[in-house]
């Protein structure tokens, strides 16, 4: 089927992630670099401002300088003490100087009475208008209530809203059972769920954030051995920069025979910092650029899509969210179907097709925080469950709804997901059974029954009605076709039919609404993309030569130097691979035919002995990204770690880093070991680094102790080598990096014992042999 595939580049902008807020240059510079990168690819962006960033003049000036009429400014709905004071509302925080995500009862609108929520909206909107001369086009937060969303829409014309993906107990938020991905019209009583009719519907589309993986995002807490990580398109995390996952996600949007609007959100909070955001975001933009040129993808602002959606649909249209193959190689597949009445999650694994998730969307299921504020530090948004494996089981006893024959055995075969028409989708277990999902329910054809492993919400079965109750709320579903046998439903005349609500019929308006388009802009010119070197920062074998190539995304000439100075008009022009035989710092700049210059790119190359035998008792973190092949194998690798702690080149431990090297005796000029500090991620430089040297490992004596920096640096993320002058003949050495026992007081996690020490390499530079 022809499909609509839409991406939003939506970035969450905070001046600070703690209360009270303070200006942090790294966070500010991260936004500047994101703005430039998105503009370099020519895409529109949506930038949602927390109140502290809204009121900071430096952020105001930056956004006014870079944004144009194709971009959108929105509100990021995290509550601060100054915003409450401006609104005349008491700030409820009792956990000052903690991260916002841990304080749902004060830093989010749920922590305030409904009338106070409106006062907070009024205060924010007044200040936003004073700064930008208009109201924000969208409003977003990890969690929001329908009171806030409705008031922002009705009082200030805000056109779109967004909330977090489904997740379990992450950062104080549990959201599970809602629209699995994409966009819907919310209910007035519960913004987490789609409205079933126009009377109960808010006239503002809600988007789900972060681009969840249709397979593994929904396997949280129920799959043994599942890969660790955050399974979203967030570029600061491993899946979001994994080419396999990113490619699979875009394929699910553009190549799958899926139903309805295929949607993804890219972007990240600026407090994750540029060094960790850039590797993933740039790779995602590169793939997007190709898909846009092929006409397969629309890149829009959130409010632009919302305006189109509101004109095109009278009710939320059904949608599927699916992948027929597994990017991770584990052999799974998944399909989600959602309508105004229910959502159904199907999982394919080892040839078995199972229902893994089923929630219903009945009228009357109100949000817990509709009429009262939250009084705990953990929030919960959900829907009435028919199958909630995370709540009713776990990794060892996970429940499904299974296809079974008369002996209780599950069939196996090839699994295929597709769409039949704009309202109906299908999942086939070829040669055995077929699920057909429509807006009112689903039908299973074939000789197999449906067996519920567990249904703790069951109150009674009356005729064809399963009557259920969850937290005092009564609901249920109808077996319109099938023979009920306890918790198994057998086929009736070759089929089973479950219904969850009335089919609303056609939800698309008859007229076709034109899609939003980009406008010509006289916005600020952005610099071209800097040159890239291959290899990047590297440690090369002593006595050999290396050739470095430079390439650029944009047309122009590249000028470079090899002594670390910035290139000038008189510097060498790059014409081919650069030959290196000794240490060098390569700096390069791209100059376009129009005379625009990129930022200067810098790359460091060192030559060192590689014939070392390394041993280490240090236990590394078990995660592959921090463990690799171990210290002994990886400290002599060629490529150096970057300022991105997830680049796979840093070896991390909660122990002291302790490494002994043995080699053919010779004169050694220096020994250096590389370290990383990124305290927001729990990584700091070691307290001290000790070097022991000797003729062999049995005769080592203390040579020197280096005290590493212990305090905020010029940049939040820093690399630094501990460099020891040896200048003598040795055959062995030992380096011990002593970690802090507790995180230092200047760190965000001050006083906690989980102090990571990270190292990337050992560099042993030979000296000159005396005659």
Segments (PLM) and residue ranges:
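Active-site beta->alpha N-cap acidic-glycine motif
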Residues: 1-69, 262-265, 334-340, 345
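Disordered, acidic Ser/Thr/Pro-rich linker "stalks" and the adjacent N-terminal cap
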Residues: 523-529, 534, 601-665, 676-685, ...
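Metal-dependent polysaccharide deacetylase catalytic core of the NodB/CE4 family, i.e.
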Residues: 52-143, 199-231, 259-272
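Catalytic domains of cell-wall/extracellular-matrix polysaccharide-remodeling enzymes
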Residues: 113-188
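Low-complexity, disordered linker/stalk regions enriched in Pro/Thr/Ser/Gly
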Residues: 520-630, 634, 639
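Catalytic grooves of carbohydrate-active enzymes
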Residues: 12-22, 29-41, 126-135, 191-305
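Acidic-aromatic substrate-binding/catalytic surfaces of carbohydrate-active enzymes
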Residues: 346-424, 430-431
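Trp- and acidic/polar-enriched beta-sheet ligand-binding modules for extracellular glycan
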Residues: 655, 679-771
């Amino acid at each position: 089927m022809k499909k609509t595939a839409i991406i939003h580049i939506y970035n969450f902008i905070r001046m600070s992630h703690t209360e009270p807020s303070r200006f942090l240059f790294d966070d500010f510079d991260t936004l500047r670099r994101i703005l430039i990168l998105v503009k370099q690819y020519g895409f529109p962006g949506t930038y949602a401002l927390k109140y502290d960033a809204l009121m900071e003049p430096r952020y105001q000036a930056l956004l006014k300088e870079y944004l144009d009429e194709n971009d959108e400014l929105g509100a990021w709905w995290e509550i601060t003490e100054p915003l409450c004071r401006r609104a005349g509302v008491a700030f409820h925080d009792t956990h000052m100087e903690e991260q916002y995500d841990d304080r749902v009862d004060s830093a989010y609108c749920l922590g305030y009475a409904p009338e106070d929520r409106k006062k907070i909206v009024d205060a924010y909107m007044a200040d936003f208008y004073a700064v930008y001369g208009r109201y924000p086009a969208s409003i977003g937060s990890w969690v929001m209530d329908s009171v806030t969303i409705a008031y922002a829409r009705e009082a200030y014309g805000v056109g779109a809203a967004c909330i977090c993906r489904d997740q379990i107990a992450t950062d104080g938020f549990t959201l599970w059972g809602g629209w699995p991905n994409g966009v819907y019209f919310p209910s007035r009583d519960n913004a987490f769920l789609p409205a079933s009719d126009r009377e109960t519907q808010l006239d503002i589309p809600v988007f789900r954030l972060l681009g969840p993986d249709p397979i593994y995002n929904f396997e949280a807490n129920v799959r043994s051995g599942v890969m660790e990580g955050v399974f979203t398109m967030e570029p600061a995390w491993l899946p979001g920069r994994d080419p396999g996952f990113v490619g699979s996600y875009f394929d699910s949007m553009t190549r799958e025979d899926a139903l309805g609007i295929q949607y993804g959100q890219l972007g990240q909070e600026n407090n994750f910092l540029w060094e960790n955001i850039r590797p993933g975001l740039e790779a995602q933009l590169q793939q997007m650029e190709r898909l846009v040129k092929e006409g397969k993808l629309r890149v829009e602002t959130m409010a632009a899509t919302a305006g189109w959606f509101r004109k095109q649909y009278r009710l939320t249209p059904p949608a599927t969210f699916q992948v027929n193959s597994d990017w991770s190689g584990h052999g799974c597949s998944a399909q989600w179907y959602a309508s105004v009445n229910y959502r159904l999650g199907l999982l394919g694994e080892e040839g078995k097709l199972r229902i893994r998730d089923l929630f219903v969307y009945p009228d009357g299921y109100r949000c817990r925080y509709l009429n009262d504020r939250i009084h705990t530090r953990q929030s919960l948004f959900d829907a009435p469950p028919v199958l909630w494996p995370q709540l009713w089981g776990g990794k060892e006893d996970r429940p499904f709804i299974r296809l079974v024959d008369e002996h209780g055995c599950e069939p196996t075969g090839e699994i295929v997901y597709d769409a039949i028409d704009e309202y109906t989708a299908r999942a086939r277990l070829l040669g055995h059974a077929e699920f057909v999902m429509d807006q009112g329910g689903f039908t299973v054809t074939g000789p197999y029954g449906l067996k519920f492993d567990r249904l703790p919400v069951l109150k009674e079965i009356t005729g064809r009605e399963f009557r259920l109750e969850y937290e005092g709320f009564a609901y249920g579903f109808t077996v319109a076709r099938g023979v009920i046998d306890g918790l198994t439903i057998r086929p009736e005349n070759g089929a089973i039919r479950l219904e969850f609500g009335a089919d609303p019929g056609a939800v698309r308006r008859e007229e076709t609404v034109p899609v939003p388009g980009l406008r010509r802009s006289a916005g600020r010119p952005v610099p071209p993309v800097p040159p890239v070197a291959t290899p990047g920062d590297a440690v090369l074998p002593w006595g050999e030569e290396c050739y470095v190539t430079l390439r650029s995304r944009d047309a122009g000439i590249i000028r470079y130097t090899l002594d670390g100075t910035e290139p000038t008009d008189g510097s060498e022009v790059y014409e081919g691979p650069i030959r290196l035989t000794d240490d060098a710092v390569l700096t390069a700049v791209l100059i376009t035919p129009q005379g625009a210059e990129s930022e200067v790119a810098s790359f460091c190359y060192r030559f060192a002995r590689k014939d070392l035998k390394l041993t280490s008792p240090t236990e590394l973190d078990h995660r592959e990204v921090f463990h690799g092949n171990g210290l002994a194998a990886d400290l002599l690798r060629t490529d150096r770690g970057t300022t991105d702690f997830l680049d796979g080149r840093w070896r991390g431990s909660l122990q002291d880093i302790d490494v002994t090297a043995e080699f053919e005796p010779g004169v050694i000029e220096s020994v250096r070991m590389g370290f990383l500090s990124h305290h927001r991620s729990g990584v700091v430089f070691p307290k001290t680094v000790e070097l022991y040297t000797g003729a062999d490992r049995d005769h080592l004596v203390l040579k020197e102790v280096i005290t590493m920096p212990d305090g905020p640096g010029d940049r939040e993320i820093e690399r630094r080598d501990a460099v020891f002058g040896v200048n003598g003949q040795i055959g062995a050495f030992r380096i011990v990096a002593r970690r802090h026992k507790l995180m230092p007081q200047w760190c965000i996690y001050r006083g906690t014992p989980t102090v990571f020490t990270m190292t990337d390499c050992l560099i042993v530079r030979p000296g000159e042999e005396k005659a």
